[in-house]
C-alpha cells in the first residue's frame, strides 16, 4: 500500500497535469473501481463529463479534486492503485479520463477506488473524520495537545 509520502508525490504529479482541465470523456472499465459510487457507472460518467477539475488535495491517503456544485472526485489508491498519464490502457486499467490528455486509473488488486462526494467546507464528507496532517495550514497543534492530554487511550485511538 502506498504510504503517505508516496501519495503526496502522486498528488504533486497529478496537480501539474490535471488541475484546471476539463473531463471530456470517462470510461469505467471495471465496476469495482467505483464501488463507493452507489449510483453506478452510468451516473458516475454522466456526472463527470464536462466537469473542470480543481487543484488536487490530499488528506491522509485520500486524494480529491473539487468540482463545481460543491462536490469532489475522490480517490484512494488502495494497495496497488496508480494514475498513469498518456498511456495505453492495460489489463489493470479500471477507469479512463480524457482531459486533453489521457489519464488512467490502474489498480491490479482493485482495493482502491474513485467516487463522487459532496464537499462540506472544502472537504469531502467521507474524509471529515480524518485529522489534518501536521504540516497542513489548518493543523492546530495546541488543540491536538489538549485532546491528547484530556484522554487516556492508546495514541492510535485518538
List the predicted regions and their residue ranges.
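Extended, highly charged segments
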Residues: 1-59, 64-71, 77, 96, ...
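Phosphate/anion-contacting hairpin/loop surfaces
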Residues: 73-158
